């Protein structure tokens, strides 16, 4: 049975954000299937991650020397795929995930007329288990489509392209934001990040890193310390006890191998636990880029360890606008539906380790609100661009 589904309805705000980092012109979002049906430049992507399944569809076409991209559909369905047993996806989780994928797969075709051959199904690098082929089989059986998996390096590169804009619309600094910044993404299955090297070569080069622990997988790791399920206080102690070896030491080794990871002073944080922190610590700030400080991370870590239930139920009475307050309440409820209290505690430990090992004190830090869709959108756009360029070359050759 599928768990609660969240649709991201605020397409206009998201579109404004996406315009800057894809460096293309997008003028409007068409939500009606009848309008979309007239355009055959439709592509869709389905991402299977450690927290669930994300789907997106775009209308992609040539516009002058660039491209015109319109986002026509996004959806997120949380699943229990990372509730592994003996380091294997359970049959129930496999079925649940395959059903979620098939639901999006069918919707893209039926409601948005995306051609079946232009829907791509991709697994996140954070999916770790001994029976990945069983997931591929379940998805292929449900959809008739093959699926592939990204490496950490590929996912970081796509996420950087999709999260960090070349230019910030809300800033006046005359710099290439992507060549001055670094991305750190705390996913459910792993923690990864990196930066794009400055240069004028024909292709972009990146420095990437990753460790195999994210919010859910670290929750699972800390839960192994006791034969019986721990209460929240005991779990917080267990997570703290293993964090130095499991998190800090592994992050430190990555930094030692690639010291340039400490050189960037503009840091973009993404991932579900960062969204949770921004929502709970700064509920009133709903911008595309939310400014954060290391004090925010320290406070979040302290409150998660000492009174996670109070943290998950913030006082919103200071927000005078009732409409805005009700919208924020929905955001808070989404956090609670997405993460268990133990997930919040585990994620706070990862944030604390990232803060320490990447020496974030004194750096400019932002939460990238729409980073959760960044790599799948980048992937779909890349596939659409590749197909369009191939078609254009074929047309040019035929005319010679």
Predicted regions mapped to residue ranges:
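Glycine-rich beta-strand-to-loop/alpha-helix junction loops that act as flexible
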Residues: 123-127, 186-191, 267-274
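Conserved phosphate-binding loops in N-terminal lobes of ATP-dependent enzymes
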Residues: 39-146
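Bacterial Sec-dependent signal peptides at the C-terminal "C-region" and cleavage site
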Residues: 21-37
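Bacterial N-terminal signal peptides
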Residues: 12-23
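Composition-driven detection of intrinsically disordered, low-complexity segments
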Residues: 9-12, 75
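Gly/Thr-rich phosphate-binding beta-strand-loop-beta motif of the actin/hexokinase/Hsp70
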Residues: 36-69, 170, 174-206, 272
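N-terminal secretory signal peptides that target proteins for export/translocation
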Residues: 1-8
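Helical "lid/coupling" subdomains associated with nucleotide-phosphate turnover
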Residues: 84-102, 106, 112-113, 129-131, ...
